[in-house]
Amino acid sequence: MSTNTVNLNFCLNQAKSHYGGFGYLTIVTLLFSSGSIILLQYLFATDQISIWLHVLLSAYLFYMIYSPLHEAVHGNISGKHQSLKWVNPVVGVISAMFLLYSYTEHKWDHLLHHKYTNDPKLDPDYFVKADNPFSVIVRCVLILFKNVPY
């Protein structure tokens, strides 16, 4: 057996010892981020925080709420518990709702992204690739409209 195969098997065995349990912390992340987003909207709507603080905190919280969506797409929340597989789409739909996105569409796109990572023709996220940070930001906004029928 080659050294690379031995190293790969070692890494796989190490990784297996860390997965399979239920993702309680992912549920906590969902509850904290969604509750905080709702509270933040209330505070802003009642003029208790500035728009700048609102934008800053919202950016962080929307970044945070993507994590449960990502874990749900991969089916990681339920772990090895077959009877809890229903938790993945529930968490995914709730997280996606806050991001004004479809869980089903994101699951499709994200798994295609993993299958075809960095393939210019097949990776759905390749559109974001650009030569400078400004172009990346613009493309990140435009990618939201890539599947809108005209």
Language-model-detected regions and their locations in the chain:
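Post-HEXXH active-site segment of zinc metalloproteases
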Residues: 78-96, 129-130
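Short active-site segment of divalent metal-dependent hydrolases/proteases
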Residues: 73-74, 117
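Structural signature of the GPCR N-terminal helical module
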Residues: 61-73
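Non-catalytic, topology-defining segments of multipass membrane proteins
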Residues: 1-59, 68, 93-150
